[in-house]
């Protein structure tokens, strides 16, 4: 192959000669890999680590030759041959296999960055991810601490090489994003399958910290602000948000998932407000949506508002307050970012979250003071009156703003429906009188005030 490549430089059939040289060289390296497999697996002349070390040397030599010749097919053939032969040597999807493929990816990185070969990045990166996933699934039946280290190393190397590829080769941006999305997935699987909750949380936190560090450097460090593309930086932020959510679900008890996700939604909401970032706002909205759905099934269920006996306690109070804070903060952040939603459905959903959070917090607080039927009835009186007061405030503010006026009218209708359909059937005695009397007085005072504002 070397001889034919040298001859092809000065001949008219140079392209054909180069192709033949690439084919011969690739065949030669493939034969060397098969020799290593035979010496290790069939005849047992060398151990598996020694065989992998020899295979790595052959791969490095092949990549060096491909770089010198600028022969992408040769580089692909060497890397893929090495990746295919490695499982034949280890015979198990273990830490040794993952470690070898990580070293192979590191060896291929300088060549693919220097020559701008995105296909080589995929050929070196995809086997690492697949081997790490298979090894994690296999390792769930066997306790192997070294496997966790190998998977963590694979994630670290994969993410870093993806970032280097995106920065050094902007034209390979999509390939780098694909590698970035794939690289952390073994850590997402390894935490729940291989580790206990605290250790799994540390693994997930490390993955999140790595992704956040790359995002922060690309976003705030002036020297790197233009090095990574906006699309890649957005992808890093999205993967960091996914990693943080997966870490939360893995490390936190299921009874506190909603509270934890809502706390993270508030943190992201503050970040979106300060940074005026649409991507951060989208992440905060996703966290808040999942937190609300989990709250309905856990800390702040609807059953706690319908029947006495299912007291939410302190978790329900905290979760309700977090729902209220999220329902207020996220629209404020959207206004500051300049991405105010125009869909009435989104505003209606936000209003429902706000009402449910306030009602759940009120119910939990009253039942913490007196976990009796009187406490339950008092909570419903306060919930109804708070809805009426909020509706009046919206109507008064909506004299010149149609959307606020419509929201106030809808909330008034909901308050009266609750008063007549639920409170009338649930409350009795003094509680019923107090609820109707207070609601009527508030509506009377607000109606007269609203009429004066309209005349003015």
Briefly describe each language-model feature range.
Residues 1-385, 394-405, 417-456:
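Extended, compositionally biased regions that are outside compact catalytic cores
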Residues 412-416:
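Pro/Ser/Thr/Gly-rich intrinsically disordered low-complexity regions
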């Amino acid at each position: 192959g070397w001889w034919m490549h040298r001859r092809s430089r000065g001949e008219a059939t140079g392209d054909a000669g180069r192709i033949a040289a690439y084919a011969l060289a690739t065949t030669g390296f493939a034969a060397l890999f098969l020799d290593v497999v035979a010496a290790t697996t069939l005849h047992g002349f060398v151990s598996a680590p020694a065989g992998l070390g020899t295979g790595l040397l052959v791969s490095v030599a092949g990549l060096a030759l491909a770089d010198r010749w600028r022969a992408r097919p040769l580089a692909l053939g060497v890397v893929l041959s090495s990746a295919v032969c490695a499982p034949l040597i280890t015979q198990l999807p273990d830490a040794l296999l993952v470690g070898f493929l990580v070293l192979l990816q590191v060896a291929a990185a300088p060549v693919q960055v220097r020559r701008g070969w995105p296909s080589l990045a995929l050929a070196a990166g995809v086997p690492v991810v697949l081997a790490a996933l298979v090894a994690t699934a296999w390792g769930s039946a066997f306790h192997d601490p070294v496997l966790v280290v190998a998977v963590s190393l694979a994630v670290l190397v994969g993410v870093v090489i993806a970032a280097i590829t995106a920065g050094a080769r902007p034209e390979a941006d999509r390939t780098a994003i694909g590698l970035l999305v794939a690289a952390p997935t073994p850590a997402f699987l390894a935490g729940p399958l291989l580790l206990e909750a605290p250790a799994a949380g540390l693994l997930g936190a490390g993955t999140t910290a790595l992704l956040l560090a790359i995002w922060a450097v690309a976003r705030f460090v002036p020297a790197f602000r233009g090095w990574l593309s906006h699309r890649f930086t957005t992808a890093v932020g999205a993967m960091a948000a996914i990693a943080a959510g997966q870490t939360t679900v893995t490390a936190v008890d299921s009874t506190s998932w909603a509270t934890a996700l809502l706390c993270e939604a508030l943190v992201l909401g503050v970040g979106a407000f300060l940074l005026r970032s649409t991507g951060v706002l989208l992440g905060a909205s996703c966290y808040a949506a999942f937190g609300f759905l989990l709250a309905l099934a856990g800390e702040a269920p609807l059953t706690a508002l319908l029947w006495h006996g299912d007291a939410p306690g302190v978790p329900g109070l905290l979760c309700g307050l977090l729902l209220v804070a999220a329902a207020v903060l996220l629209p404020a952040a959207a206004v500051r970012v300049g991405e105010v939603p125009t869909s009435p459905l989104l505003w209606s959903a936000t209003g429902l979250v706000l009402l449910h959070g306030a009602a759940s917090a009120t119910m939990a607080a009253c039942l913490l003071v007196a976990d009796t039927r009187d406490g339950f009835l008092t909570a419903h009186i306060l919930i109804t009156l708070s809805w009426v007061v909020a509706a009046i405030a919206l109507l008064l503010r909506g004299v010149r703003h149609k959307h606020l006026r419509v929201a106030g009218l809808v909330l008034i209708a909901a308050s009266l429906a609750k008063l007549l359909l639920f409170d009338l059937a649930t409350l009795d005695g003094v509680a019923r009188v107090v609820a109707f009397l207070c609601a009527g007085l508030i509506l009377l005072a607000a109606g007269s005030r609203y009429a004066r504002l309209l005349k003015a």
